Amino acid sequence: MNAVEIQGVSQRYGSMTVLHDLNLNLGEGEVLGLFGHNGAGKTTSMKLILGLLSPSEGQVKVLGRAPNDPQVRRQLGYLPENVTFYPQLSGRETLRHFARLKGAALTQVDELLEQVGLAHAADRRVKTYSKGMRQRLGLAQALLGEPRLLLLDEPTVGLDPIATQDLYLLIDRLRQRGTSIILCSHVLPGVEAHINRAAILAKGCLQAVGSLSQLRAEAGLPVRIRASGISERDSWLQRWTDAGHSARGLSESSIEVVAVNGHKLVLLRQLLGEGEPEDIEIHQPSLEDLYRYYMERAGDVRAQEGRL
């Protein structure tokens, strides 16, 4: 059974359609990255899964049931983009309050505070917390009750690099335990190693969904090969240019060649067999490259101007 099934869903507000025939599934124990510009339909999709909206057309199933089913809500955790708590309560009091509301065991509170790195500040009032600390408290709240499905909306907002890496490691552990996760983010660097698939929305339409290897194959973006310590650099540049490849020198003994149309292995064999390089680096298209490609294909001006 899929954790989430969205079938033929369109969402309208009056005469405005904000989602167009969306079909998207989330498997059990899968992490799906949901990406798109502001107004792409990410928030609407999250609200449909949370049961806060009913689709104008189509069907949404969460854990095999309607999203607003009480049994579903007890098994769902949600971290909103903007986290707000009672400022006069301590971190521990806040988490105990939410545990009671959710029917979760109070014994989880201290464990979760430790898990998100707030044990040292558990008895401080939330009004003294930094934005990053409030974000981590929000994550602890979302993890109450050991949810089967976790929705994370911009979870790295306000986190420093170390806290961000800790969050991704926590996501990895949750995935290993079988938790299904939808991670909605504008911050693309660092995400790709921690998701199973990416879904890219633009203008209310699903532009692409799949693993990064599937999206790379579909997009056909080039792979860049860099070799350093190579002998006869100029002859290699001439050879590849004559063969129709895009190549350039990076220094007196290093070069870069762009591999397109499945030529990566051919170029690597040539380099390793004849060039005797000291080092080779292979640069696959990143999640940012793929995002930009699909945004430009959809005609999103911000991507074309170089802004995510």
UniProtKB/Swiss-Prot annotation:
GO molecular function ontology, one term from the record: ATP hydrolysis activity
Primary location: membrane
pH relationship of activity: Optimum pH is 8.0-8.5.
CC per GO annotation: plasma membrane
Domain ABC transporter: residue ranges: 4-228
Residues noted as binding ATP in the record, renumbered to the chain: G36, H37, N38, G39, A40, G41, K42, T43
InterPro entries linked: AAA+_ATPase, ABC_transporter-like_ATP-bd, ABC_transporter-like_CS, ABC_Transporter_VariousFunc, P-loop_NTPase
Activation/inhibition comment: Inhibited by AMP-PNP. Partially inhibited by N-ethylmaleimide, orthovanadate and NaN(3).
Source domain of life: Bacteria
Entry's induction text: Induced in response to denitrifying conditions. Activation requires NosR and DnrD regulators.
Topology within the bilayer: Peripheral membrane protein
Chain ranges passing through the membrane: none
Family: Belongs to the ABC transporter superfamily.
Identification of the protein by name: Probable ABC transporter ATP-binding protein NosF
Protein's organism: Stutzerimonas stutzeri (Pseudomonas stutzeri)
